[in-house]
Amino acid sequence: MINEERLLKVLLAPNISEKATTAAEANNTVVFKVATDATKAEIKAAVEKLFEVTVEGVNTLNVKGKVKRTGARFGRRNDWKKAYVTLAEGSDIDFVGAES
């Protein structure tokens, strides 16, 4: 079993974008920004424990930080990790919290 304190540090934020919204509607998939050292097993355990849903699969990718300019200097944004979490049929995570 994975430490509960570690599970709380794995998921950083939901990643809301046009692509994430399309994936959510078409494939019952939710996109999260996760810790860069998180494994697929940790991500699956964290989502199942925190949101009380059943996870079918997890796909991850590392997003490279963009180079940005501030005046004459160049800087670089941090690299981060993205996780596409596919939920089982009938499972749903509502980030907005609107009751209908």
From Swiss-Prot:
NCBIfam families from the UniProt entry? PRK05738.1-1, PRK05738.1-3, PRK05738.2-4, PRK05738.3-2
Q: Which GO terms describe its molecular function?
A: rRNA binding; structural constituent of ribosome
Spell out the subunit comment: Part of the 50S ribosomal subunit. Contacts protein L29, and trigger factor when it is bound to the ribosome.
Q: Name one GO cellular component term.
A: ribonucleoprotein complex
Q: What is the protein's given name?
A: Large ribosomal subunit protein uL23
GO BP, sorted A to Z:
translation
Which keywords does this Swiss-Prot/TrEMBL entry list? Answer: Ribonucleoprotein, Ribosomal protein, RNA-binding, rRNA-binding
| Species of origin | Colwellia psychrerythraea (strain 34H / ATCC BAA-681)
Instruction: Tell me which Gene3D superfamilies the record gives.
Output: 3.30.70.330
> What's the superkingdom here?
Bacteria
Give the similarity note.
Belongs to the universal ribosomal protein uL23 family.
Instruction: Relate the protein's function as given in its record.
Output: One of the early assembly proteins it binds 23S rRNA. One of the proteins that surrounds the polypeptide exit tunnel on the outside of the ribosome. Forms the main docking site for trigger factor binding to the ribosome.
**What Pfam family is a match for this entry?**
Ribosomal_L23
Q: What is the lineage of its organism?
A: Bacteria, Pseudomonadati, Pseudomonadota, Gammaproteobacteria, Alteromonadales
